[in-house]
Amino acid sequence: MLDCIKNRYSPRSYLNKEVEQAKIDEVISAGLRAPSGRDLQQGIVICITNKEVRNNLAKLNASIAGMPEGVDPFYGARVVLLVAHKVSPLSDLNGAAMIENMLLEAQNQGLHARWINRGKKELETSEGKNILKMVGLNPDEYVGVDHVILGYSNEEPSIKEVKPNRVFYIK
């Protein structure tokens, strides 16, 4: 497991290559198995592979971030996993655990993944609420967390060094 963690990186460019459904399913399964407060398991994953929906979400995300028109905040990845959670004081924490599990399982599956922010703000907009409605969820009951983008990297791996002096012991 530690090798998987050490070798994981977040590419900024993805190949225009389809991701196998079985691999997507395994990544999602890992997210759904993340720990959650009181084991309520209220986090959800919306898997977006529809090109039009994905591109509209990318435009919304870029707009929220103040990116110039035409910039793809999903870096060309064909799969966007939008993590949301039932409204709760633990939404961010539970959702973050789901995202971390999915990032690691993507690496395990030979995929590349990146955590993309602004999910909360997206689902506060009418466009974001429509995504929840598309899958039959009540937008008033869910808050956005963030995204995991999946695909195959178009870059050489760049493993970053761990910054020193970040662990302290009390014995």
Which ranges hold each PLM region?
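Acidic, surface-exposed loops and disordered segments
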Residues: M1-K171
